[in-house]
């Protein structure tokens, strides 16, 4: 009987060795593929999602101005653009686009390029309240010189028997929430018996200090209006960097009214709030920022700007 190569002992040994080598090479290739896939997954952009109406973190619909980005932001982080003393001293040129700002949160307050009105960010949408009271959606390319945002979770709630005044609201929330050395984001939806708001008109270079510009603000009072208070509370130790205490903006449900809140009163309401444990400050990369004296104590002037109200109110803003 003829003997084939496979029947020879030396051939069997060679075949066994070849099989081991082949298996080793297959294992090596598989390992390399797994490593490559793992690296690809780790480098894929993270997507910050907007909470859906049912409370899940489903991605927002296509085309919506929402907080989607490649930046991973802690849910309890406050992010601010520039510092308040720079804005007080007239640094009004926008440095961050609204699209980029939304990477850091879907809730907040601020202003727009050249101090063009009040900025309100609610549910990932941006609203610009102009100096004449009209309200526009903020374009992704619009820039801000100062803003404060956070991803809003509505983690905690506090029932309010009434809102007697803005001062009452501040004091009541401080007592109920506590955490005096941390940042708080607050959202309150209610029907307001009365509310007084302000906005400022767009400025042109050379810019005047905010304390001067605020004297020319437009002020409106409206009764029986339903809408949302958007508030950021900063601890007192941020003086010079942000606004110590509460910074309130308001937006009516029908978008007919909005602005920086000076006074308000309402019946019972529910305050939803987040306690923020992290704080990120993005400094200005703009001409003049490194030479301006930010060490000045502008707190008294800031308090006047935040609460100032002209005796003569402007004509009520037009309804949309």
Spans of model-derived segments:
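N-terminal secretory signal peptides that target proteins for export/translocation
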Residues: 1-23
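C-terminal motif of bacterial Sec signal peptides marking the signal peptidase cleavage site
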Residues: 39-40
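Short, low-complexity, disordered segments immediately C-terminal to signal peptides
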Residues: 45-62
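N-terminal low-complexity or amphipathic/hydrophobic leaders
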Residues: 83-147
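A glycine-rich, hydrophobic loop/mini-helix early in the fold
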Residues: 129-176
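Long, positively charged binding patches that form subdomain-scale interaction surfaces
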Residues: 167-232, 239-241
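Histidine-centered divalent-metal-coordination microenvironment in nucleic-acid enzymes
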Residues: 243-251
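A hydrophobic, small-residue-rich beta->alpha segment in the mid-to-C-terminal subdomain
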Residues: 252-295
